[in-house]
């Protein structure tokens, strides 16, 4: 007798699921712009690859600093207020690009990106665990992969539209404040919507008591081996994924394969592979275990990075593009596996996991290596990151048996 497959989300949670999923699109857009900004600022401000890496360092430092405070805020005031506050910080960071563009000072842009990164931290800390709770635990990973697919859509739209705008040859192109002002206005409108809508608060019914507050919860988390392993794997993934995205345009243009404008379009195509991987992963994981899918994809990423490092022309480019398909399911899959069976520790765990985008600072190391004259060698860093994910995938598959 066949068991009936549980629905992706319960009917009563459908509206909250749709609303929260819009946030995934927003931060996908905001984070993908960074990958275009690197080359834009190198061209406009005459800075090196390593110097431009401070775009990622300041943005993702916001995640590292604000993840725990964001979790404490959400624990006390709830998911909805956490989302609204995050959106307001997001908008403020976007509008700070206006004085940055006026003064053409890299440091002002970095301050704006730090504030924006703090806002994104609130959104991701609230939205990722919230989506996993909007339905059956059996479909949590699939549900999060579906929401994260819209993150991929935001990334595609960002690299395509902003890339075309910033790399235009006429005098109107290149004003980086314009897309950020538009983004800030959209974010404020969405913040208004969330301030008027009541989101159901999800209260786990099982787990440890919260005696001792947030610090006590953190101490309990680090006594859970599978959570600690998931945290390490997620950090390694972020090092790999963000570094590849940030270096993509520099790599393909440095190899002489294409111009900046064409490179931003090819990056858009790569992110389309990423989105297809997310949607496909959501479908596959309703039929195949998340652990097994993660293992296959980790192997695919390691092989893809090896193809890039072999430096065999168009085959290396194909390997780089295919990697986007394989890496697509990693963040939501590792995230949901790390949160499994944590009960009332889920919010605290989410805060800790949302510190992992600080791995984006790894692009600084890639930039330093690239500035040394070898454009291929920097890919050793993402290869190492995916190797850690592969080890984690092997471990969770063995634990499942």
Please provide the spans of the model-predicted regions.
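Extracytoplasmic
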Residues: 15-45, 127-128, 244-249
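Extracytoplasmic gate region of multi-pass secondary transporters
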Residues: 34-35, 219-268
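Helix-to-loop junctions at the C-terminal end of transmembrane segments
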Residues: 66-79, 166, 277-289, 370
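C-terminal ends and interior cores of transmembrane alpha-helices
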Residues: 88-103, 299-312
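Intracellular juxtamembrane helix-capping segments at the cytosolic ends
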Residues: 122-136, 328-343
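Helix-loop-helix hairpin linking two adjacent transmembrane segments in secondary transporters
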Residues: 138, 143-198
